[in-house]
């Protein structure tokens, strides 16, 4: 039988497993919120550790916290930051919308670990109290939003942006490799005028580059922190200068330019910066969906599709059709993009629900944002390494499609007029003949004139 210790809160005593650092409120949450399997993201756990350490340092600097207690909190919080106490954060996403249970989970874990470091008895709340000391100058209402911003900014900066830059570099390499290959363009999924395969891939590279810039533009908002607003934004029970000092400490811990939000009422009641930042992530998903779709369609075949690209063959594709290989990386990426679209819909609605002085959809917003970041970062790397870098052009198929395209007639329009050029294309399509046969046979141009004008290599840029 598991040994327990007695923890207490304002509701009275409750038993907690002896080897767990959490306390009464986290234990009650385990019983009260048996909902789903989605746990608080470890990025949030780390961020809560950062907040607790920064708050202890700020409170000591402002003369509010006994240095002996503060130093123990700093050490215990560092273990949270380093991931050494992850197993002691068992709570699910689906809890109070302010994240109070998770904030108290952090307070209790840091308190009990600090007590242990000081040689005290876990659960005694002495000499380190979870509320009076670990949560000093804080409220869940400003702590969890601060942790959200820290976690989301860290993961965007350290995971998503590097992954997108990795993809961008690979696409740029394909732009150079394919620059000499002229192919038929397609608009409305129908034949259009020529371009190079490199030009086509340059569009993909530009989409990713623009996505990176858009996401970076949203970081200043994510780097504004609610800490110091306490319960409703007034800063009640926090000393003058605490908000600025704690933001300074968080910036020092993370190496990211976090600052104190200029208006704490907005920082608690609205999370527009989260919605805005995820909007850029959502736009990135839209871009990646388009890129993955184009690549898998251009690689369709191998004999009965467009067949302009040869995609890497990573695994068998069918349990019934021998030899079949599928564009699995494209399919995985597009599924991720769909999930991000759904996350954005939920996050947008949640962001609109700041009733009066507090938004109470915080855990949902944090979970969806962080899931989008992780999925897109992982998928971008997987797509790059297992698909993009190995893409090859099937130049024979590309040339065959170019040679039989009727849209090369566009080059004749300035010479013989739009209507005549249209007649040539329609007649050639109806009769199954070539543009040359109809243009020369119809007396519109001579063979020499046709050769001088209908040259795909001269049609890939301004005249």
From Swiss-Prot:
Known pathway: Carbohydrate metabolism; tricarboxylic acid cycle; (S)-malate from fumarate: step 1/1
UniProt: substrate binding residues: 98-100, 129-132, 139-141, 187, 319, 324-326
Marked site: Important for catalytic activity: 331
Active site residues of this protein: 188 (proton donor/acceptor), 318
Enzyme class: lyase
Subunit organization: Homotetramer.
Protein name: Fumarate hydratase class II
TM ranges: none
Similarity-based family: Belongs to the class-II fumarase/aspartase family. Fumarase subfamily.
Domain of life: Bacteria
E.C. designation(s): 4.2.1.2
Record's catalysed reaction(s): (S)-malate = fumarate + H2O
Gene Ontology terms: biological process: fumarate metabolic process; malate metabolic process; tricarboxylic acid cycle
Function of the protein: Involved in the TCA cycle. Catalyzes the stereospecific interconversion of fumarate to L-malate.
Gene3D superfamilies: Fumarase/aspartase (C-terminal domain), Fumarase/aspartase (Central domain), Fumarase/aspartase (N-terminal domain)
Residues spanning the signal sequence: none
Family matches, as InterPro entries: Fum_hydII, Fumarase/histidase_N, Fumarase_C_C, Fumarate_lyase_CS, Fumarate_lyase_fam, Fumarate_lyase_N, L-Aspartase-like
Record's subcellular location: Cytoplasm
Coiled coil: none
Keyword annotations of the record: Cytoplasm, Lyase, Tricarboxylic acid cycle
Gene: fumC
SUPFAM superfamilies, sorted: L-aspartase-like (SSF48557)
Other comments on record: There are 2 substrate-binding sites: the catalytic A site, and the non-catalytic B site that may play a role in the transfer of substrate or product between the active site and the solvent. Alternatively, the B site may bind allosteric effectors.
A single GO molecular function term of this UniProt record: fumarate hydratase activity
Annotated GO CC locations: cytoplasm
A Pfam family annotated for this UniProt entry: Lyase_1
